[in-house]
Amino acid sequence: MKNRRRIYEGKAKILYEGPEPGTLIQFFKDDATAFNKKKHEVVDGKGVLNNRISEHIFNHLNRMGIPTHFIRRLNMREQLIKEVEIIPLEVVVRNVAAGSLSKRLGIEEGTVLPRSIIEFYYKADALDDPMVSEEHITAFGWASPQEIDDVMALAIRVNDFLSGLFMGVGIQLVDFKIECGRLFEGDMMRIVVADEISPDSCRLWDVATQDKLDKDRFRRDMGGLVEAYQEVARRLGIMNENEPPRPTGPVLVASTDVVKGKPH
């Protein structure tokens, strides 16, 4: 596999050519970035945790009939995914005021919003991913009106599922980001959820303590990033309950075997 062709490298993942046509291998890196890579560190074990948490969530979405690019996890850091044409938008769903929304509109962080709000951001690091409207999206041809409707419908379904999943383990889903892509199957095309869903792309607060269990720990120099991600994995039933966190990386449950996450 050393000679496999690299298709794309982003801030937190690498895409490689897959074993079959129409597939890719998604590799999760340990890089932690914020503010479009203005802040960057390597955090041992983060990629392993994001791979496992994202696998857990995407498996649930697939079983519920919410279409995604996910096929299966290959190992501790890699997933087999369907190749899609990514729509150049970050789709953000907000349930509670936090981050840029609080700053932009002067709403106190932690305020529950009157209803879930969907926002679109154009994927362009050089421009700091500017917020855009549906008018921008259709005018510049990033997506058609029907595709926007499909993306929004997916975002609402994902939000409903994730809110229940996390609330069931004592975590409040404050907001999250997804990306969507066009999956071509013969003469058919459909919009599917792509990228990842993990504490890197969600704001997750402990219901009882309001502790942050997401990438805000890195953005705000709070420390304890891996420990927070481990706690999310533990509550979701991914981590072995009886295994204490170790400095060399998280210990995770894969099927019936306990395997140790090692940095690549």
UniProtKB/Swiss-Prot annotation:
GO CC, alphabetical: cytosol
Pathway assigned in UniProt: Purine metabolism; IMP biosynthesis via de novo pathway; 5-amino-1-(5-phospho-D-ribosyl)imidazole-4-carboxamide from 5-amino-1-(5-phospho-D-ribosyl)imidazole-4-carboxylate: step 1/2
Name of a matching Pfam family: SAICAR_synt
Reaction it catalyzes: 5-amino-1-(5-phospho-D-ribosyl)imidazole-4-carboxylate + L-aspartate + ATP = (2S)-2-[5-amino-1-(5-phospho-beta-D-ribosyl)imidazole-4-carboxamido]succinate + ADP + phosphate + 2 H(+)
E.C. number(s) listed in UniProt: 6.3.2.6
GO molecular function: ATP binding; phosphoribosylaminoimidazolesuccinocarboxamide synthase activity
Family: Belongs to the SAICAR synthetase family.
Protein name: Phosphoribosylaminoimidazole-succinocarboxamide synthase 1
Source organism (scientific name): Mesorhizobium japonicum (strain LMG 29417 / CECT 9101 / MAFF 303099) (Mesorhizobium loti (strain MAFF 303099))
Encoding gene (name): purC1
